[in-house]
């Protein structure tokens, strides 16, 4: 088990988790009652298997922990808790954190600098998050730090490093790669036209295939209306991989809302 040289707060086990309150966020509002029940069951197992560790004075409570667990389990709702194997701890800073980053350039020189990170994940090792960006992950805006890092973990199940191609049947790999690169190019074209700040999809998606998969996974679950119509072929591949269709949930929820309004008249 990793020992960290600073004082940390761990969430205790056997909590009486406030699931009803934890579910009351825009990200989860379109789940059916059956999906919510299964998500809670997965989140309970997640909290039994993983340590949530608060760093640098940040304080966890049962509601924060329950919501974190629910979001962690949303991408694996139809895949199973075993898809989150490979790490045992979630480290949570109060805000984005500074790390020492090293990289090698084209001629072999190694460079290093201090950079601010929102989150990090590795194939073997903890997931590192920060509370400010977790808070921004509760809505349905297309941004979700937890889903982003979970997507990297799912991606890395297919090899030593994230490639943008998760563990899918071999026959589907070429098509997935083609559609993912087409999406990256389309996003880059929009960035070139309107600039990063005005792009409708986070510009980070154009960085490389691994980041494209992670960023579009955020949109898949939290803003399907921005993903599905723009990249319909890739959307279907995401639906097949995650075994979910958030766009369909959104349509059903909207239809039920319209029906309810008509019934009141």
Swiss-Prot record:
Domain of life: Bacteria
Catalytic activity, EC: 3.4.11.-
GO cellular component terms, A-Z: cytosol
S-S bridge residues: none
Role noted for this protein: Involved in the modulation of the activity of the glucose-phosphotransferase system (glucose-PTS). Interacts with the transcriptional repressor Mlc, preventing its interaction with DNA and leading to the modulation of expression of genes regulated by Mlc, including ptsG, which encodes the PTS system glucose-specific EIICB component. Shows zinc-dependent metallopeptidase activity.
Record keywords, A-Z: Aminopeptidase, Cytoplasm, Hydrolase, Metal-binding, Metalloprotease, Protease, Zinc
Major place of residence: cytoplasm
Organism: Salmonella agona (strain SL483)
Cofactor: record remark: Binds 1 zinc ion per subunit.
Subunit note: Interacts with Mlc.
The family this protein is said to belong to: Belongs to the MtfA family.
Entry-linked Pfam families: Peptidase_M90 (PF06167)
Residue positions binding Zn(2+): 111, 148, 152, 211
Protein's cellular compartments: Cytoplasm
Alphabetized InterPro entries for the sequence: MetalloPept_cat_dom_sf, MtfA_enterob, MtfA_fam, MtfA_N
Cofactor(s), names only, from the UniProt record: Zn(2+)
GO annotation, biological process: proteolysis
Name of the protein this chain belongs to: Mlc titration factor A
SUPFAM superfamilies named in the record: Metalloproteases ('zincins'), catalytic domain (SSF55486)
Alphabetized GO MF terms: aminopeptidase activity; metallopeptidase activity; zinc ion binding
């Amino acid at each position: 088990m990793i020992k960290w040289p600073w004082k940390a707060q761990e969430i205790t086990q056997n909590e009486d988790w406030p699931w009803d309150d934890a579910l009351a966020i825009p990200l989860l509002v379109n789940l059916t009652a059956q999906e919510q029940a299964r998500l809670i069951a997965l989140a309970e197992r997640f909290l039994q298997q993983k340590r949530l560790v608060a760093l640098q004075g940040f304080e966890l409570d049962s509601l924060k922990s329950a919501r974190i667990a629910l979001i962690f389990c949303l991408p694996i709702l139809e895949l199973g808790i075993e898809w989150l194997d490979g790490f045992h701890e979630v480290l949570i800073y109060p805000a984005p954190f500074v790390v020492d980053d090293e990289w090698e350039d084209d001629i072999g020189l190694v460079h290093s600098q201090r950079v601010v990170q929102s989150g990090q994940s590795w194939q073997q090792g903890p997931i590192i998050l920060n509370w400010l960006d977790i808070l921004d992950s509760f809505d349905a805006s297309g941004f979700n730090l937890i889903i982003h890092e979970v997507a990297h973990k799912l991606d890395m199940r297919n090899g030593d490093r994230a490639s943008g191609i998760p563990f899918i049947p071999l026959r589907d790999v070429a098509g997935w790669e083609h559609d993912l690169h087409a999406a990256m190019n389309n996003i880059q074209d929009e960035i070139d036209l309107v600039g990063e700040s005005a792009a409708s999809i986070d510009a980070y998606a154009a960085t490389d295939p691994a980041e494209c998969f992670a960023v579009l996974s955020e949109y898949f679950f939290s803003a399907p209306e921005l993903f599905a119509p723009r990249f319909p072929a890739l959307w279907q591949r995401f639906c097949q991989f995650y075994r979910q269709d958030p766009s369909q949930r959104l349509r059903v929820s909207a239809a039920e809302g319209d029906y309810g309004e008509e019934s009141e008249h």
